Structure formats: structure tokens, C-alpha cells
Amino acid sequence: MFQGASSLNLDAKGRMTIPARHRDALLLQCEGRITLTKHPDGCLLLFPRPVWEMRREEIAKWPISARAWQRIFLGNASDVDFDGAGRILIAPELRTAAGLTRDVMMMGMGGHFEIWDAARLAESESDAIAAGMPDVLNDFSF
């Protein structure tokens, strides 16, 4: 299970170094083979390839009424591998879709990661806090 936030930078070629704590786990779990795709919240999703392959099968079975969402998730999926320095190359189309510039955040979300433009994530979190807790979390406490 992946958790935690990492503040990272994209280089001029659109490469991002995976933090060592996650890189080691991803190398063990999937030999550094991952899949990136769009998320409608304005970020990218990063899945270990075996996890993505299960998700891909589920998404492919969605009814025709969900075709646009299949296009968003499957049509934008990009398989990538770590390079020798533990970096991944994020395709220009995906960088543009998520508004990724130089400063990015990688958020562990259990079985996958979200990759956000740092400013966009800060705005999203601020909006969520201002909106208050959703009703579904009324009974949740630490």
C-alpha cells in the first residue's frame, strides 16, 4: 500500500524521479513497469502495471453508456518503465492534461498514486476544506 506525499520536479524533458521509498517497492512489485492515465479531477493516476491490467479489464467491461469514461481512462493510458536513474517520462499529452509544470506532487493513494501539479493540488485541497466534510464521513474519526 502506498501512502504519503512527495514534492518532486519535472525536468525539461518531462521526466520525474520516483522517490526511493516508492521506487524500491515498485521494482519489487512490478519491475518498474507502470501505467499512467488521466483522472477527471485534473491529475494523473500512476498504477503498477499488474494493478492497471486488472483495472483495464474492469473498465473495458463498462456499458456503452460509459464509453466517454472508457476513452478518458483507457484511451489516455500510457505504459512506461523506469530508466536507469529511476525516472519515468511523462508524455507531453498527459503533462498538458494535468497541467504539470515543474513542481509536482506524488501522492500515495493505497494501490496507486496521483501525480498533481503542486499549485493545482493546493487549490484542490483548499476547495475541499472550504466545502467541509462530505456526509459520508460524518461517522469517521481518528
Swiss-Prot record:
Keywords: Cytoplasm, DNA-binding, Repeat, Transcription, Transcription regulation. The keyword Transcription regulation applies. Residues 5-51, 77-120 form the SpoVT-AbrB domain. It is found in: Cytoplasm, Nucleoid. Its main location: cytoplasm. Gene3D superfamilies: Transcriptional regulator MraZ domain (3.40.1550.20). GO terms for biological process: negative regulation of DNA-templated transcription initiation. One of its GO terms (molecular function) is DNA-binding transcription factor activity. The keyword Repeat applies. Belongs to the MraZ family. Forms oligomers. This is Transcriptional regulator MraZ. It comes from Herminiimonas arsenicoxydans. The lineage of its organism: Bacteria, Pseudomonadati, Pseudomonadota, Betaproteobacteria, Burkholderiales.
